[in-house]
Regions:
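Walker A (P-loop) phosphate-binding loop of P-loop NTPases
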Residues: 41
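Post-Walker A helix-loop "phosphate-sensing" segment adjacent to the P-loop in P-loop NTPases
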Residues: 53-64
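Conserved nucleotide-sensing/catalytic segment adjacent to the nucleotide-binding pocket
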Residues: 64-67, 73-121
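ATP-dependent NMP and nucleoside kinases share a basic, alpha-helical "lid"
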Residues: 124-161
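Extreme N-terminal, non-catalytic leader segments
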Residues: 1-33
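Hydrophobic positions on the alpha1 helix immediately C-terminal to the Walker A/P-loop
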Residues: 47
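Conserved lysine of the Walker
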Residues: 44
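The Walker A (P-loop) glycine that initiates the GxxxxGKT/S ATP-binding motif of P-loop NTPases
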Residues: 38
Length: 161
């Protein structure tokens, strides 16, 4: 029988930060990707941003947040497909593009900009964030990072933890 451990977000982060730093130290200088997945409103964006802040407090400039919300299909495309009522479901994202982007980001030696999602306009925006070349830890957050079927399936294989 397994025991359930309940932790506050801060307690979870205090355990996670040393673990991530250990993984990064064993990566031989290559970028690593740490995934935080969860449903809408679960706190993954807040937790991910705090993880990046804490990692950068220990090793300045070492971590960057990579939100996957920018891989929603453009709203016009969702309307065209008649999927507005299903917006946010896995098939209303550009899953293959997210896999391609994350693969490129893990191997890039230059600054890379990524798309974001604006709640203000309810659509994606280009160049919402930039990952600097010196970043070694990508904190990837999104709803569907752990899916094993469909276009998102390739993301899980790119995550180191």
């Amino acid at each position: 029988m397994s025991e359930t451990i309940r932790l506050t977000p801060q307690a979870a982060l205090s355990r996670l930060v040393p673990h991530v730093l250990e993984i990064e130290s064993q990566a031989g200088g290559r970028r690593i990707a740490i995934g935080l997945a969860g449903g809408p409103g679960s706190g993954k964006s807040t937790l991910s941003a705090e993880l990046v802040t804490m990692l950068n407090a220990v090793k300045p400039g070492s971590a960057a947040l990579v939100p996957m919300d920018g891989f929603h299909m453009k709203h016009a495309r969702i309307e065209e497909l008649g999927l507005v009522e299903r917006k946010g479901a896995p098939h209303t994202f550009e899953g293959a593009a997210s896999v391609s982007f994350l693969h490129h980001l893990k191997h890039a030696n230059e600054a890379v900009s990524g798309p974001g999602y604006s709640r203000k306009i309810e659509d994606t925006v280009d160049d919402a964030f930039t990952v600097a070349p010196e970043v070694k830890v990508l904190v990837v957050e999104g709803n569907y990072l752990l899916l094993t079927e469909g276009l998102w399936a390739g993301v899980k294989a790119l995550l180191d933890y």
